[in-house]
């Protein structure tokens, strides 16, 4: 079995990687990357898992699929590379972070400081065709990310932040007896005013972590960063 993720996620997801469904997904992606512009770059597909090993995960921020404009997607939900303009959803996340905890927005969207503390920045679908949102839905990614969420849920002690209807569907595979769910509208400009703003996800996540005996996340991002 080829190593796709260089930490304990490889073992956790091995049954998926060895499944016929993943073989079909792999064949689909091989053709897509050969003939179209696909984001993120192939070596960044599993970046969220690389940044935050399974045994370190305390929080999951679940997105839908990667950004589909040039230079944006880095393989981690809502994050962009240093030097890339902040997408509107991330601008709204920063506004809510300031409203919730008082941290002023930083001028980059590189969220690795969160990932380093145990925040898994996971999209439900890990690839997308340029300019075509949701174009890689229903090709097999959902089974892999469901398996990742189910494994974390079984381990327990995780706060799942579910923004928007697609993310909320993942609640079906989360055991709420030993994990916490914080759900609201999506931070996109289309829906942020319908329940995302004012939802205080950051302080509520830290309260849930402390209730489970875990250390809180320092949500304040550094002003200067460089990409790994």
Curated annotation (Swiss-Prot):
It catalyses: Hydrolyzes single-stranded DNA or mismatched double-stranded DNA and polynucleotides, releasing free uracil. Gene3D superfamilies: Uracil-DNA glycosylase-like domain. It is found in: Cytoplasm. It is an enzyme of class 3 (hydrolase). GO terms for biological process: base-excision repair, AP site formation via deaminated base removal. The keyword Cytoplasm applies. Keywords: Cytoplasm, DNA damage, DNA repair, Hydrolase. Pfam families: UDG. GO terms for cellular component: cytoplasm. One of its GO terms (molecular function) is uracil DNA N-glycosylase activity. It comes from the Bacteria. The active site is at residue 65. The keyword Flavoprotein does not apply. Excises uracil residues from the DNA which can arise as a result of misincorporation of dUMP residues by DNA polymerase or due to deamination of cytosine. NCBIfam families: PRK05254.1-1, PRK05254.1-2, PRK05254.1-4, PRK05254.1-5, ung. This is Uracil-DNA glycosylase. It comes from Lacticaseibacillus paracasei (strain ATCC 334 / BCRC 17002 / CCUG 31169 / CIP 107868 / KCTC 3260 / NRRL B-441).
């Amino acid at each position: 079995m080829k190593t796709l993720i260089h930490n304990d996620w490889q073992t956790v997801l091995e049954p998926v990687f060895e499944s016929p469904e993943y073989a079909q997904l792999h064949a689909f992606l091989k053709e897509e990357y050969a003939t179209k512009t696909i984001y993120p770059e192939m070596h960044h597909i599993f970046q969220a898992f690389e940044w935050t090993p399974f045994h370190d995960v305390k929080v999951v921020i679940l997105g839908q699929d990667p950004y589909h404009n040039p230079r944006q997607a880095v393989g981690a939900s809502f994050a962009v590379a240093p030097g890339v303009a902040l997408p509107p959803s991330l601008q709204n996340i920063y506004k809510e972070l300031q409203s919730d905890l008082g941290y002023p927005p930083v001028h980059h969207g590189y969220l690795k400081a969160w990932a380093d503390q145990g925040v898994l920045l996971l999209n439900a679908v890990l690839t997308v065709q340029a300019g075509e949102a949701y174009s890689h839905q229903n090709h097999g990614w959902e089974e892999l990310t469901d398996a990742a969420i189910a494994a974390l849920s079984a381990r327990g002690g995780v706060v799942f932040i579910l923004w928007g209807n697609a993310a909320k569907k993942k609640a079906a595979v989360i055991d709420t007896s030993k994990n916490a769910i914080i759900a609201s509208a999506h931070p996109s400009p289309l829906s942020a005013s319908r329940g995302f703003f004012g939802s205080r996800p950051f302080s509520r996540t830290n309260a849930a972590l402390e209730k489970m005996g875990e250390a809180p996340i320092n949500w304040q991002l550094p002003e200067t960063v460089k990409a790994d």
